[in-house]
Amino acid sequence: MPWRIEDLNQVLDGLGRLAELLTPSPIDAPALSLPGGRHWSRLHDAPGSVDALDWLDPWVRHNLERLAAQEADFDQAAAGSTLVHTDIRADNVLLTGEGAVFVDWPHAAVGAAWIDLLYFLPSVAMQGGPEPNETFWAHPVSTIADSDAMLAVLAGITGFFVHCATLPAPPGLPTLRRFQAGQGQHAVAWLRRLMA
């Protein structure tokens, strides 16, 4: 499903409104942390798991140590006071005449206001939308994002996508790992560009 620009703009506008409305967080929620810990470190410690990923840019295999070091600052970099969804993607958004509605919040946490935008953009690129870097920095919510913090968070979530793509599919979600692999490919390309 390629993104139509008007639909994408509706979601991007909604993400801006969401950040405004949910800062500070209106509920007590846990601080954002990387689900499952440090994924590049896991892949670094078990390099065979990366070698099996024929879809993965070879740059990753040559830079696992750098990627693991980059994700180490995730918790500090992701800190903030905004209630964030952490799983914005096309199937968690309803487009209405009054704007985007974000559904399915089981992983809500408190973090930086720009987290949802960053997490969302690899799936947009995967589904025929624009490349993420320009879209991220053109969005108003990115004005409060420090580039080093953004890079640490991008490294962390990219490691999550890539590592999860190597795992068996959970019951009832047979396409999840393929989706995460697609997110991972586009996130790796974004990360590689920023780490060049």
Question: For each predicted feature, which ranges?
Answer:
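Hydrophobic/aromatic-rich alpha-helical bundle segments in the mid-to-C-terminal region
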Residues: 29-30, 168-181
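Regulatory N- and C-terminal appendages and interdomain linkers associated
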Residues: 182-196
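Active-site activation/catalytic loop segments of kinase-like enzymes and analogous catalytic loops
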Residues: 114-144, 154-172
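A cross-family kinase active-site recognition segment
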Residues: 1-61, 79-81, 109
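Short proline/glycine- and basic residue-enriched helix-capping loop/turn segments at helix->loop/beta transitions
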Residues: 62-70
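Hydrophobic multi-pass inner-membrane translocation pores used for secretion
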Residues: 77, 89, 120, 145-148
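Active-site acidic catalytic loop and adjacent metal/ATP-binding pocket
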Residues: 69-115
